[in-house]
Amino acid sequence: MGSVGSQRLEEPSVAGTPDPGVVMSFTFDSHQLEEAAEAAQGQGLRARGVPAFTDTTLDEPVPDDRYHAIYFAMLLAGVGFLLPYNSFITDVDYLHHKYPGTSIVFDMSLTYILVALAAVLLNNVLVERLTLHTRITAGYLLALGPLLFISICDVWLQLFSRDQAYAINLAAVGTVAFGCTVQQSSFYGYTGMLPKRYTQGVMTGESTAGVMISLSRILTKLLLPDERASTLIFFLVSVALELLCFLLHLLVRRSRFVLFYTTRPRDSHRGRPGLGRGYGYRVHHDVVAGDVHFEHPAPALAPNESPKDSPAHEVTGSGGAYMRFDVPRPRVQRSWPTFRALLLHRYVVARVIWADMLSIAVTYFITLCLFPGLESEIRHCILGEWLPILIMAVFNLSDFVGKILAALPVDWRGTHLLACSCLRVVFIPLFILCVYPSGMPALRHPAWPCIFSLLMGISNGYFGSVPMILAAGKVSPKQRELAGNTMTVSYMSGLTLGSAVAYCTYSLTRDAHGSCLHASTANGSILAGL
């Protein structure tokens, strides 16, 4: 009869029958009996004696995302795991005032990326060990703690010396990096199990975080002349937004819509979606003998025990009554997968999505070569510290637009995406011309860096989102969480290399701060600057 529990539908046997058109003996494996029966209904096979089984759990309608609430929640999830880091680097005016003559923004960027790379590698290993929501919750807590600590102890109470505060801020950025990256990597695996538009929603949320933080910094700086007070309010607003994202996640994870999609890949390991409590069975019907055998791949039987003595085996007599039952799934203790199995799972996924992995890595490598490091050091004698704030705001806003454009239904091939991502390398020499030669750059007008930042932001948002969105659809449902985590590893690899290269550009801006004699008088008011 073939091995029990196999996943193929065996051909019916017609040998030795009086009529070749009558099936006398047939065997079905696992839940494929229902699939065959459903197909048979449309062809009128029921009249020829083919048994039909139906399961009401399979007819459950797909829940609706009413009022796009789940999409909005996923957008805020994207806000939640980039908002803390953006909060640290967007108050660039406060950092330059408190730590003059230092590479604080470069140090924060490199610290964040190095810790984030380690975190995403660890999360990729633990994806089969720790539950999804455990990782996300831990990420939120690790992001909220440092934000609140720096707001109260450093910005408000100023409990530390300059050197201590410098080190503590870097440590806070490292803690935020670990928490937010575990959270980010988990969310991409999370949304990979949902329809594609929700991955795009998370990536749009990343850009929304930048836009919200840039607007928050501009408003607090305009409304509160005192730099310390404006920075404190700025950080407290960030804490409130992060807390809102966390609370919304706790609500959405229990919604019918999310549970419908996130439990399907889990159930597919057991057979068909929706049959989560069963463990599969085999049906064998011999018309000549009048027997119907139901077998289940139960644990190995004792040597002296017959298969028909197993509780997973049932026979009906010649009366023709069919029985269906599921044997409860045995409780199996979850154990660590072997190192070879981990590598094999990732290799299988990477073979399918390699072009998307390279595309997203190249996109973020080029971006991190320039943002936030080099962009934060661009100066103008009239606009002063307002210019880097405006440039970063333009980038965040255009990145937001690019990620919205990523929702357009364009059929990209992976190699074409990779080629377009590589073309963005042209932004590196263009931005260098905005700061070099030091004190008298070739493109000294403030409009140039704003235009380049606009174009770089749109292309970063688009080509940083499309590969992530498409990758999850190229693998099977049970591989989507792993594909999301693997794409995040590529994403973080690009960020890490880009941050390392960005340090090479710091020497180009080292003397730019003293090139403007009147820059300090222009920083007090945006009206005076314009």
Curated annotation (Swiss-Prot):
The record marks 206 as: Essential for cation selectivity. InterPro entries: Eqnu_transpt, MFS_trans_sf. Changing residue 220 to I: Loss of dopamine, serotonin and MPP(+) uptake. GO terms for molecular function: efflux transmembrane transporter activity; monoamine transmembrane transporter activity; monoatomic cation transmembrane transporter activity; neurotransmitter transmembrane transporter activity; nucleoside transmembrane transporter activity; organic acid transmembrane transporter activity; organic cation transmembrane transporter activity; toxin transmembrane transporter activity. Residues 90-101, 161-166, 253-351, 403-416, 472-486 are cytoplasmic. It catalyses: serotonin(out) = serotonin(in); dopamine(out) = dopamine(in); (R)-noradrenaline(out) = (R)-noradrenaline(in); (R)-adrenaline(out) = (R)-adrenaline(in). Changing residue 163 to A: Loss of dopamine, serotonin and MPP(+) uptake. The keyword Acyltransferase does not apply. Changing residue 242 to A: Reduced dopamine, serotonin and MPP(+) uptake. Residues 1-21 are annotated as: Disordered. Pfam families: Nucleoside_tran. Mainly expressed in brain and skeletal muscle. In brain, expressed in cerebellum, cerebral cortex, medulla oblongata, occipital pole, frontal and temporal lobes putamen, spinal cord, substancia nigra, hippocampus, caudate nucleus, nucleus accumbens, pons and choroid plexus. Expressed in heart, in both cardiomyocytes and vascular endothelial cells. Also expressed in adrenal gland, small intestine, pancreas, kidney, liver, bone marrow, lymph node. Glycans are attached at residue 523. Activated at acidic pH. GO terms for cellular component: apical plasma membrane; basolateral plasma membrane; plasma membrane; presynapse. N-glycosylated. Electrogenic voltage-dependent transporter that mediates the transport of a variety of endogenous bioactive amines, cationic xenobiotics and drugs. Utilizes the physiologic inside-negative membrane potential as a driving force to facilitate cellular uptake of organic cations. Functions as a Na(+)- and Cl(-)-independent bidirectional transporter. Substrate transport is pH-dependent and enhanced under acidic condition, which is most likely the result of allosteric changes in the transporter structure. Belongs to the SLC29A/ENT transporter (TC 2.A.57) family. This is Equilibrative nucleoside transporter 4. It comes from Homo sapiens (Human). The lineage of its organism: Eukaryota, Metazoa, Chordata, Craniata, Vertebrata.
